[in-house]
Amino acid sequence: MLEIKNLKAEINNKKIIKGLNLKISQGEVHAIMGPNGSGKSTLANILSGKPGYDISGDLKYEGEDLTQISIEERAQKGMFLAFQYPTEIPGVNTNNFLRTSLNSIRKAKGHKDIDAISFLKIVKEKAKELSIDEKFLSRHLNVGFSGGEKKKNEILQLKILEPKLAILDETDSGLDIDALKIVADGVNSYKNKNNSFLIITHYQRLLNFIKPDFIHVLS
């Protein structure tokens, strides 16, 4: 599904990743650990298409050159990034954002848009699984949300969009144990033989709840 060979990355002439090799097959869960500055979040940024990095090496997603796939196309092709610091977007209703995102992916696959009533039923069901109060669905995206609420909202997006490859960038950061368990349960309920995860974390505690097939340590 994802294959990285000899990835090197720098920004503003500062070398961050100095030759990373990684292969993630369908159905696998990989965890990446390491100290600050080791390149964990840089890797997530590069995979999601964030500009500003000078990179070399081979990055392939489902056999395609990832560097030639736009950010929008990456999402449409089944890539998903849960941010370490989810962005607040004033004026954008959470429910509408989720439905628009899902319909963009459905359109790319040649499927019809899902109507508002049908979607509301789905999103309420998924929100309940994550102990998310329905009132958050009508609020502006992440605006005024606590850290834990933002992280749970990211996992709600994951469960709605159903990506093939989910990249979780320090999703456990700032979570208390109860929120951590809810987030982990949300991830575990989505895991199956058809999707893969790349979990980036500072802490072992997340891996007590989400069991990876492989653990990689960056230095």
Model-derived regions: residue spans:
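Conserved structural motif at the start of ABC-family nucleotide-binding domains
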Residues: 2-4, 17
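Helix-to-loop junction immediately C-terminal to a conserved catalytic motif
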Residues: 48
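ABC-family P-loop ATPase nucleotide-binding domains
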Residues: 87-164
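H-loop (His-switch) and adjacent beta-strand-loop-beta switch element
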Residues: 210-219
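ABC ATPase NBD Q-loop/coupling interface
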Residues: 58-74, 142
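Walker B catalytic motif
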Residues: 170-171, 178
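The feature captures the beta-strand-to-loop junction immediately N-terminal to the Walker
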Residues: 33-35
